[in-house]
């Protein structure tokens, strides 16, 4: 069966088939090889791309800008104070304005509905750079990195997310794993298990692809035989102190330590993280956490983060290659 991703938006991985997702991942591999060989393409030549960032970013912004420019596109960045979206101008109106000027739009913000509205009314491909509910571009990089390091087919890679089971990255990983027919464990406290809507959607997809979704409260049981141990920050910046205290109490037993990695009983297991990570006190936030809560490490220990099992910087680089693949697949000539 043939397919064409041109002019498709990239809002959530559940919108894609296994074959379509594999195509984007394989394209990312090809584009990465081409970049390493010194080849700069022109698949996006003459295209104008808008990057809407309601939330600041390092990896996502750089990945879109470098990826677009590598393939010949022009990029306009609209930061948190650089547009009227949702404040002085509705998302629907913004979509129609930008759709008349740009060939593609990246959106990184709060609401998944805003991303959907942009896609509905702009008339051009819209790419989800992160919302409170989902983070699909991150998952392509996570999967590509795991395949590169583990030398396994996607369907044979077993992922375990350890931490907040309602996290947007965990949601995206769960949906992506279901699409690819993978086994995916959410290792989380009872209070933070995935929402029924996301879990039901992932299970419905997995039933068709041969994937397996497991929710587990016990860390040792949840990580056994896993290939990839994944975590994310416990609390987003700007949340009140009470939330930090509550989350730390709930999630401290789910910190990824050397013992957690050993509990996989898999000597080849790797550690992934979407970054930034609070693994030491080298940042102002890290220092504040230590002063206020007595923790020098949060979701992952520095020992694991800096270990040979950690592939977080290869994973970060792959954000650019996979995002470039999404743009080329949906917008390229």
Curated annotation (Swiss-Prot):
GO molecular function, a single term: amino acid binding
Stored InterPro entries: Asp/Orn_carbamoyltranf_P-bd (IPR006132), Asp/Orn_carbamoylTrfase (IPR006130), Asp/Orn_carbamoylTrfase_sf (IPR036901), Asp_carbamoyltransf_Asp/Orn-bd (IPR006131), Orn/put_carbamltrans (IPR002292), OTCase_ArgI (IPR024904)
A Pfam family per the record: OTCace_N
Binding residue positions for L-ornithine: 168, 232, 236-237
Protein species of origin: Pediococcus pentosaceus (strain ATCC 25745 / CCUG 21536 / LMG 10740 / 183-1w)
Primary localization class, coarse: cytoplasm
Subcellular location(s) of the protein: Cytoplasm
HAMAP family linked: OTCase
Membrane-spanning segments: none
PANTHER family, A to Z: ORNITHINE CARBAMOYLTRANSFERASE, ORNITHINE CARBAMOYLTRANSFERASE, MITOCHONDRIAL
Residues annotated to bind carbamoyl phosphate: 57-60, 108, 135-138, 274-275, 319
Protein name in the entry: Ornithine carbamoyltransferase
High-level lineage: Bacteria, Bacillati, Bacillota, Bacilli, Lactobacillales
Enzyme class: transferase
Family that this chain belongs to: Belongs to the aspartate/ornithine carbamoyltransferase superfamily. OTCase family.
Pathway where it operates: Amino-acid degradation; L-arginine degradation via ADI pathway; carbamoyl phosphate from L-arginine: step 2/2
NCBIfam families on file: orni_carb_tr, PRK04284.1
UniProt keyword Heme, yes or no: no
Assigned EC number: 2.1.3.3
Keywords: Arginine metabolism, Cytoplasm, Transferase
One GO term (biological process): arginine biosynthetic process via ornithine
GO cellular component annotations of the record: cytoplasm
Described function: Reversibly catalyzes the transfer of the carbamoyl group from carbamoyl phosphate (CP) to the N(epsilon) atom of ornithine (ORN) to produce L-citrulline.
Encoding gene (name): arcB
Reactions the enzyme catalyzes: carbamoyl phosphate + L-ornithine = L-citrulline + phosphate + H(+)
SUPFAM superfamilies: Aspartate/ornithine carbamoyltransferase (SSF53671)
């Amino acid at each position: 069966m043939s397919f064409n991703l041109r002019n498709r938006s990239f809002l959530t991985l559940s919108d894609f088939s296994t074959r379509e997702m594999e195509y984007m991942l394989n394209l990312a591999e090809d584009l990465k090889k081409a970049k390493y060989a010194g080849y700069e393409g022109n698949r996006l030549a003459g295209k104008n791309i808008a990057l809407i960032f309601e939330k600041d970013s390092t990896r996502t912004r750089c990945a879109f800008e470098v990826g677009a420019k590598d393939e010949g596109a022009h990029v306009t960045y609209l930061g948190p104070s650089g547009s009227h979206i949702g404040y002085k101008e509705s998302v629907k109106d913004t979509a129609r304005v930008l759709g008349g000027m740009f060939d593609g739009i990246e959106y990184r913000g709060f609401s998944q509905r805003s991303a959907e509205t942009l896609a509905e009314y702009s008339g051009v491909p819209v790419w989800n750079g992160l919302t409170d509910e989902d983070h699909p571009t991150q998952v392509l990089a996570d999967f590509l990195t795991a395949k590169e390091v583990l030398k396994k087919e996607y369907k044979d890679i077993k992922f375990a997310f350890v931490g907040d089971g309602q996290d947007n990255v965990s949601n995206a990983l769960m949906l992506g794993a279901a699409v690819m027919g993978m086994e995916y464990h959410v290792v989380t406290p009872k209070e933070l298990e995935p929402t029924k809507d996301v879990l039901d959607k992932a299970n419905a997809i997995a039933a068709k692809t041969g994937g397996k979704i497991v929710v587990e409260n016990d860390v040792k049981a949840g990580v056994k035989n896993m290939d990839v141990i994944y975590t994310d920050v416990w609390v987003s910046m700007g949340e009140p102190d009470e939330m930090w205290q509550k989350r730390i109490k709930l999630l401290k037993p789910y910190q990824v330590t050397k013992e957690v990695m050993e509990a996989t009983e898999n000597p080849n297991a790797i550690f992934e993280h979407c970054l930034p990570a609070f693994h030491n006190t080298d940042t102002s936030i890290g220092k504040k956490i230590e002063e206020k809560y007595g923790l020098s490490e949060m979701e992952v220990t520095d020992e694991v983060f800096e270990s040979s099992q950690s592939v977080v910087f290869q994973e970060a680089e792959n954000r650019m290659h996979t995002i470039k693949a999404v743009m080329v697949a949906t917008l390229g000539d």
